[in-house]
Design a protein with these regions (language model features):
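Thiol/disulfide oxidoreductase modules built on the thioredoxin-like
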Residues: 97-103, 108-156
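Short active-site neighborhood of thiol/selenol oxidoreductases, capturing the structured segment around
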Residues: 39-58
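Structural microenvironment flanking redox-active thiols in thiol-disulfide oxidoreductases
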Residues: 61-100, 110-116
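Short cysteine clusters
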Residues: 7, 57-60
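Alpha/beta-hydrolase fold active-site loops
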Residues: 47-48, 79, 127
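N-terminal "domain-start" segment that seeds a small globular fold
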Residues: 12-40
C-alpha cells in the first residue's frame, strides 16, 4: 500500500499459534505496565479499539495524540481504547508518562501479532488497529498511523452498529 507508514517485525520474530479470532482477542490476559494482569474480556460489550503498537515504531508514536483525544471524546459513548504494546513494561510505562496516555496499555511480546494477523493484519505491520462493535464483531481495521478524522469515522460506524 503506497503512502502508509508502518513498522514491521522480522518474520522470524512472529511465532505460530492456533487460529485466532475476535474471541482470541477477548481471551488475552496481559499485564499492564505496572505488572497487573488485565483481561481484555473486561471490555466486552463496549466498542473496543485494540491498537497494536510499539514504543520504537515512529508511526505508532505519531498516532498516539489522536488516540488519546478519541478516548476522551468517545468514552461517554461506550468506547474503550486499549493499546497492546510490543515492548518491555518499563519502556511502555515511561512512554505512557511522557505521552500522557489516558487509556490502558498492555504489555506483550511479538507473539501477540498472531492475533493481529488473524484479525486482518496479514502484513504484520505496526501500528494496527481493530475496532470491535459491542457484539464483538469486527467493525473496522486500519494498518498504519490513524489521523483523528479516520478514528472518528471508525468510531461513528462502530457506535451506530447494534
Amino acid at each position: 500500500v503506497t503512502g502508509v507508514q508502518t513498522c514491521a517485525l522480522p518474520i522470524w520474530q512472529v511465532f505460530r499459534s492456533a487460529k485466532a479470532t475476535t474471541e482470541a482477542l477477548y481471551a488475552l490476559q496481559l499485564p499492564d505496565a505496572d505488572g497487573r494482569l488485565q483481561a481484555v474480556a473486561q471490555w466486552r460489550g463496549r466498542v473496543l479499539v485494540a491498537n497494536f503498537w510499539a514504543t520504537w515504531c515512529e508511526p505508532c508514536r505519531e498516532e498516539m495524540p489522536a488516540l488519546v483525544a478519541a478516548q476522551q471524546a468517545w468514552r461517554s459513548k461506550g468506547v474503550q481504547i486499549v493499546g497492546i504494546g510490543i515492548d518491555s513494561a518499563a519502556k511502555i510505562r515511561d512512554f505512557a508518562v511522557n505521552y500522557k496516555i489516558s487509556y490502558p496499555l498492555l504489555v506483550s511480546g511479538p507473539e501477540v501479532l498472531d492475533v493481529a494477523r488473524h484479525l486482518g493484519n496479514s502484513a504484520g505491520g505496526l501500528p494496527y488497529t481493530v475496532v470491535l462493535a459491542r457484539d464483538g464483531a469486527v467493525s473496522g481495521r486500519h494498518l498504519g498511523a490513524l489521523q483523528q478524522g479516520q478514528i472518528d469515522s471508525l468510531l461513528a460506524r462502530a457506535t451506530a452498529e447494534a
